[in-house]
Regions:
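Active-site nucleotide/adenylate-binding loops and adjacent lid/helix of ATP-dependent enzymes
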Residues: 106-190, 197, 209-211
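Flexible loop residues that form catalytic
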Residues: 54, 81, 134, 155, ...
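Short glycine-enriched loops at secondary-structure junctions
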Residues: 35-38, 81-83, 104, 209-212, ...
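ATP-binding N-terminal substructure of ATP-dependent carboxylate-amine bond-forming enzymes
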Residues: 1-102
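ATP-dependent carboxylate/phosphate-activation module, predominantly the ATP-grasp catalytic core
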Residues: 170, 174, 194-200, 204-260
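Residues that mark the start of a beta-strand
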Residues: 3-7, 149, 191
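Short, charged, surface-exposed secondary-structure boundary motifs
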Residues: 42-44, 60-62, 107-113, 160-162, ...
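A short glycine-rich, hydrophobically flanked beta-strand micro-motif that places a catalytic Asp/Glu
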Residues: 262-269
């Protein structure tokens, strides 16, 4: 019996390697690894590997389509936000399957400010949040809160990119100016919101044609490289424990069904 060919992007990285090791437990799959780094892809436990351009490159689409046309995988699994966004955009050109929500849902979920507005409009409870359009907005934003700590973060990006706790407007200005001057981000790429104390949960689910297949949740107990991060936090846990919380599940199901108009399909995190 011929094996099912599956592409894993970001192969060689921690998240992708977890997926690879899990799929490798079953012998019916032939894994193809993609990554932008020849060094990282070299350590991926895959059957074949390709160095590809970054998703932001104008050559990305052509190269990906070329490899897919040649290797003929049944499925491609991206493991980072830039490739999720780009592959979703070009899905009609790809001669393979993408187990994705519709593109409108993908684009909305990759923009935290747009998703916040969607949530408010649809009665989904979220932290009070304001968009920073200029540095002059920051002080008036702080005046709206009566909190010791606020949360300043980038609108797009994973792994808590550009995110930290701030206690006053000067700290927020410094933080945003740093990312603007040193990392090339725009002032308008940031939001400031209330910082929610308490436990920190992640919830992942798989849906097919509007039907929930699997949902699992975990409480983040500690964070990868937390000591070296200004916020002492990350969306990537070093240690987490599985939890079963029907209130959490109900909240996530409600949000996903509103996001997908009852037609959820793919993986939601």
């Amino acid at each position: 019996m011929s094996k099912i060919r599956v592409v894993i992007t970001g192969a060689g990285g921690g998240g992708a390697n977890n997926i690879i090791s899990t799929i490798k437990e079953r012998e019916k799959y032939d894994l193809i690894g993609f990554d932008i780094s020849p060094y990282k892809i070299a350590r991926a436990n895959v059957d074949s590997r390709f160095v590809v351009p970054p998703a932001s490159s104008p050559d990305y689409e052509e190269k990906i389509c070329e490899i897919i046309n040649k290797e003929k995988p049944a499925l491609i699994i991206p493991t980072n936000d830039p490739e999720v966004e780009k592959l979703s955009e070009i899905r009609n050109r790809l001669k393979t399957e993408l187990f994705f929500p519709d593109h409108a849902s993908v684009a909305l979920c990759l923009n935290k400010w747009k998703f916040h507005n969607f949530a408010i409009e649809n009665g989904i409870r979220v932290a009070e949040t304001y968009h920073v359009k200029s540095l002059e907005d920051i002080e008036p934003i702080f005046s709206k809160f009566n909190s010791e700590l606020l949360w300043c973060r980038a609108i797009k990006g994973a792994g808590s990119k550009g995110a930290t706790k701030v206690k006053d407007s000067e700290q927020a200005k410094w933080w945003i100016k740093y990312w603007n001057e040193m990392r090339g981000m725009q002032i308008s790429d940031f939001t400031i919101s209330e910082f929610l104390p308490g436990k920190d949960f992640a919830c992942q689910s798989t849906w097919k044609d509007g039907r929930l297949i699997l949902m699992k949740a975990a409480e983040r107990l500690s964070y990868i490289e937390a000591a070296s991060r200004p916020s002492n936090m990350s969306s990537s846990p070093e240690l987490a424990k599985t939890v079963y919380d029907t209130n959490l599940f109900d909240f996530c199901i409600d949000a996903i069904e509103k996001l997908s108009d009852g037609k959820a399909h793919g993986n939601y995190d």
